[in-house]
């Protein structure tokens, strides 16, 4: 069975047992009345069952309802169908004030019907020939308004300065000021020029997201013809069907696939209603993607530390133990489905580097947009500052130093011999984003 943990907030007067049973019925075989065609099938075999209910500590009138869905209710290899069943009509149910899907347990038999990520973490490392450290990226800013040539120039400067990747922003598709084909050409030029000068393999996440699946595939084909290593897709706005098609194309044609989660906070940010991001992360691993944005813990975007680490492990590891202290409701086994690299991006700069290195470890991409391009000396020195800071943190960690306690000291020591890093440290020494997260663990 597929197991689901729902956070249910019933309307006043509705007992939790009734609410839980209603969720299970509406998202499987039930409807609002008894119908004579019920007698033509075996409802006992196909109905969803609410098998356990527990109150949420510290929250009045909220319950975690566990529901089991027979596997035959779902089409094989279709994230789209899985979500249509589990989170379809039921979220508009009048008997509930709010409903949130907190976690899913996907049985090994169903996981095996998915291709998963096009390549996975180890194959990506081998393609890039980069080991033993997080990868560095940069989102090109301003996200909208640059011409293709200026955009390509910014990519080149960042890659030349020491970054591994640059990135199209999620809303860069094919607008009047910069058509997709022009952008692809200038970015490919930036990649090849910087590769020749640095001797390292470089990439730019070319956003293939488009208004139709056919147009999206056309862009992916053109990227492959240019010989670039990686493309990008907005998987929630583009849709799971389009994303799975693109992931299959990427595996068949040797392209890595970077996934942006634009629109996720509409779905996952409220604590009592929606779908938790750990479920969207599992869905992405099944649908297919080699990278996905996962929050930073320390930057400008929402993300509580233990919760973030919980779904980062769901993305990377092969086997995950149940751990309610990190928001993981079920033990799960990915049966050798390739892992996804989490991408930390959003309001981060060199002073965050020790924390990011400690939190995310080697199998991650640390992406500094403003934290690269906002350097007072320009894009290339911004890239140099980030690379120096990263190398210093990785070396310190490998020497056994405590990054959490000594992080600032490590950065200051490195800035003594790197003027680019010293300038970056000076610019961002006061920048903080200190707001309480909306989505926290239940205590």
From Swiss-Prot:
Its EC number is 4.1.1.39. Substrate binds at residues 89, 139, 143, 261, 293, 345. One of its GO terms (molecular function) is monooxygenase activity. One of its GO terms (biological process) is reductive pentose-phosphate cycle. PROSITE patterns: RUBISCO_LARGE (PS00157). Keywords: Calvin cycle, Carbon dioxide fixation, Chloroplast, Disulfide bond, Lyase, Magnesium, Metal-binding, Monooxygenase, Oxidoreductase, Photorespiration, Photosynthesis, Plastid. The keyword Chloroplast applies. The basic functional RuBisCO is composed of a large chain homodimer in a 'head-to-tail' conformation. In form I RuBisCO this homodimer is arranged in a barrel-like tetramer with the small subunits forming a tetrameric 'cap' on each end of the 'barrel'. It is found in: Plastid, Chloroplast. The disulfide bond which can form in the large chain dimeric partners within the hexadecamer appears to be associated with oxidative stress and protein turnover. The active site is at 141 (proton acceptor), 260 (proton acceptor). This is Ribulose bisphosphate carboxylase large chain. Heterohexadecamer of 8 large chains and 8 small chains; disulfide-linked. The disulfide link is formed within the large subunit homodimers. InterPro entries: RuBisCO, RuBisCo_large_chain_AS, RuBisCO_lsu_C, RuBisCO_lsu_C_sf, RuBisCO_lsu_fd_N, RuBisCO_lsu_N_sf, RuBisCO_lsuI. Binds 1 Mg(2+) ion per subunit. Belongs to the RuBisCO large chain family. Type I subfamily. GO terms for cellular component: chloroplast. The record marks 300 as: Transition state stabilizer. RuBisCO catalyzes two reactions: the carboxylation of D-ribulose 1,5-bisphosphate, the primary event in carbon dioxide fixation, as well as the oxidative fragmentation of the pentose substrate in the photorespiration process. Both reactions occur simultaneously and in competition at the same active site. The modification N6-carboxylysine is found at residue 167. Mg(2+) binds at residues 167, 169-170. Its cofactor is Mg(2+). The keyword DNA-binding does not apply. PANTHER family: RIBULOSE BISPHOSPHATE CARBOXYLASE, RIBULOSE BISPHOSPHATE CARBOXYLASE LARGE CHAIN. Pfam families: RuBisCO_large, RuBisCO_large_N. It catalyses: 2 (2R)-3-phosphoglycerate + 2 H(+) = D-ribulose 1,5-bisphosphate + CO2 + H2O; D-ribulose 1,5-bisphosphate + O2 = 2-phosphoglycolate + (2R)-3-phosphoglycerate + 2 H(+).
